[in-house]
Regions:
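Cytoplasmic-side transmembrane-helix entry/capping segments in multi-pass membrane proteins
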Residues: 76-88, 110, 134, 140
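Hydrophobic, membrane-inserted alpha-helices
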Residues: 7-13, 90-92, 146-154
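C-terminal ends of transmembrane helices
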Residues: 63-75, 124-131
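Helix-coil boundary and interhelical linker segments in multi-pass alpha-helical membrane proteins
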Residues: 1-7, 34-52, 93-108, 157-165
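Alpha-helical transmembrane segments of multi-pass membrane proteins
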Residues: 58-66, 112-123, 174-177
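Transmembrane alpha-helix interface/packing and boundary motifs in multi-pass membrane proteins
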Residues: 13-23, 66-70
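Membrane-interface capping segments at transmembrane-helix boundaries
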Residues: 72, 177-187
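Mid-bilayer segments of alpha-helical transmembrane spans in multi-pass integral membrane proteins
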Residues: 88-97, 101, 105-126, 148
Length: 187
């Protein structure tokens, strides 16, 4: 595997994961960077993402998502709707960013769906708990944190994918440590 292929996979992994938190942030980041810089190169048919029409639509959808996701109950309805949109965004992002290295689009789409879908399931499952334990007061805070994390992950995935992989490895190690420790306490 070449360095370019590895970096493309790392970028695809990071962007698809970010899409599990907010579908439109990584899509808009990729579209804008592809349109305005040389940091992102999109091959056909994904280069359509960098058109001003698509960028405008993504910006409007992001605005709606950001506003709706801050309101208790509306955020739960939004999460149901996003159950299809976030994995689809993950599929598009994974396929678009690995298209340069020739990864089969179906395999890329499956990877993106799994990554974004997995993150979305965790997010959607945790949000009702936040609503119930904080009487809805915590929703805007948690939603804002999710949006910031999605944006930072998107930028890191493009600019420094090695760093993002290191952060994922650390997060995975911490999760495994927490899970093992929790299981030991239960015994």
């Amino acid at each position: 595997m070449t360095v370019q292929a590895f970096l493309s996979l790392a970028t695809a992994f990071g962007l698809s994961t970010a899409a599990g938190l907010n579908a439109y942030i990584p899509l808009l980041v990729v579209a804008l960077l592809a349109r305005l810089t040389s940091l992102v190169t999109l091959n056909e048919p994904y280069d359509a993402m960098s058109s001003w029409w698509v960028i405008g639509v993504l910006a409007v959808l992001l605005l709606v998502e950001v506003l709706v996701d801050k309101v208790p109950l509306a955020d739960t309805i939004n999460d149901v709707i996003q159950t299809i949109i976030r994995p689809a965004a993950g599929a598009i992002l994974f396929a678009a960013t690995t298209n340069v290295i020739g990864l089969h689009p179906v395999l890329a789409a499956i990877c993106g769906v799994i990554l974004a879908g997995g993150i979305h399931v965790v997010k959607a499952g945790g949000r009702p708990v936040v609503s119930a334990t904080t009487a809805g007061v915590g929703n805007p805070i948690v939603s804002t944190i999710e949006d910031v994390v999605s944006f930072v992950m998107s930028v890191l995935a493009i600019v420094v994918p090695y760093l993002l992989l290191a952060l994922f490895a650390i997060a995975l190690a911490l999760f495994i440590w927490w899970y093992v420790r929790r299981r030991q306490r239960m015994v």
